[in-house]
Amino acid sequence: QYEPSSGGRMMNSHYGTRSLDPLGQWKNLTSQINSSSDISPTASQMPRLLGLAFASKLFRNNKALDAFTHFSNNGDEVAFGTIGNASTSEGHFFEIMNAAGILQIPMVLAVWDDGYGISVPNTIHTIKESISKVMKGFQREKGTNGIEILVARGWNYPEMSAAFEKAT
């Protein structure tokens, strides 16, 4: 009522690490914790997440990049990302997950599924009401590429910690 443009759904807490110093020069990204900020359109963080993970793989496999030590620790980085369950209904979510499985990149994605997408129940935005069930065809099998799918209850800290440990 008071904010008709978005119905109060403006996500205004998108924070990120500054990668440039005040003079516009690159900082040493390997000596700081780096966070890439989300952007408002749903699932739009997915292409960036893929790019960060693929960059890590390139730094690991391309010796021509060895001189750029301020960007990577020899490609040992893992790109972590998060997405809400309703945003997994966006097409680029599936495109990125397919590319991640093909490229075999160091990427961990947490899907926060509380049964709703902003205010819409899973029954009307996700087939089978579970993105992990939908993604079963992407599951890596012995001798193939693909992705690992781990399921943990977000409110169970030891279970979540174990899942993240296994993922990395």
Task: Give short role names for the model-derived ranges.
Residues 81-83, 148-153:
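Short catalytic-loop micro-motif centered on adjacent basic/acidic residues
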Residues 106-111, 148-151:
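Short hydrophobic alpha-helical runs that function as membrane-insertion/retention elements
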Residues 1-103, 110, 121-139, 144:
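Cofactor-binding active-site loop characterized by glycine-rich and histidine/acidic residues
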Residues 156-168:
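Structural signature of the thiamine diphosphate
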Residues 115-118:
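Short gly/pro/ser/thr-enriched loop/turn and capping motifs at secondary-structure boundaries
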